[in-house]
C-alpha cells in the first residue's frame, strides 16, 4: 500500500538521495523508488512541498518559490550529514532539481518525466499554456479525474494515497514560471544527469526530455526512453526498469 507521508531511510553516511515529487502529487509518486534505493544501500529523503503537505479535496494555491525554499532547506540539512547529495526529480520536481543544481553542488541528477511543457494534442486550437494564462485565469481548480498510470492496480493504490482531487491552476502557472527561470540556466549545469521519459506520456510533452538533454552543459548525460508507461513512470508498468537505471546511474563512477 502506498503512503503520502514523507520519510527518511538512512543507510550510507556518504551518499544521500533527495527525491522531489510532482505538482499536485506527493511522496507516494516516488515511494517505491525510494524504498528500492534504500534496499540497495543508499540513504533516501523525501518531502512534500509546502501547499502539498495536507489532505484536502481541492489543491491549495502555492508558488514555486515556496516549493524551492523547502527543497533548499532540506538539501542544506542533508549536506550537514552526508558527503554527497544526489537529487531525483519527478515531473515538476525536475525543474526544481535543475534550479538547485544551477546554484549548489549536486553529485548526480536524475530527471523522471521532466515537466518542461504540457502535452499538446492535435485537436487543441492553442497550446495548453495559452489557455492557462488567458481563460484559465478565471478558474482556480479543475478536477483531476484519473491519475496517469497504465498499471491498473497501482493506479488504484495511488488514488488512495493522493491528497487532492483537483489541480490548482495558479500553481500550474507558477510551475511554468519556474520552467522559464530554469531554461536559461541549463547550459551552465555541469552535473552528471540521467533523464528517463516515456513516449506514451499523456501529461508532459516528451520532447521536453530531448530539450533538456540537448541544452544541458554536462558532458555526462543520458536519455533513456520508456515505451509502455504513462506520466508517473516510477509507479507504472516499467517501474523496474526505472529503478534499475536510476540505481545504476547513481553508482557509476564519474
What are these regions (language model features)?
Residues 89-93, 97:
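Gly/Ala-rich beta-loop-alpha elbow adjacent to hydrolase catalytic centers
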Residues 210, 214-232:
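Catalytic histidine neighborhood in serine/cysteine hydrolases
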Residues 24-34:
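The serine-hydrolase catalytic nucleophile loop
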Residues 33, 191, 205-214:
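Short alpha-helix in the alpha/beta-hydrolase fold that links the catalytic acid
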Residues 189, 195-197, 201:
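Short beta-strand/loop motif that positions the catalytic acidic residue
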Residues 38-56:
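Conserved alpha/beta-hydrolase
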Residues 227-254:
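Catalytic active-site module of serine/aspartate enzymes centered on a nucleophile-bearing elbow/loop
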Residues 168-185:
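Active-site nucleophile elbow and catalytic-triad environment of alpha/beta-hydrolase enzymes
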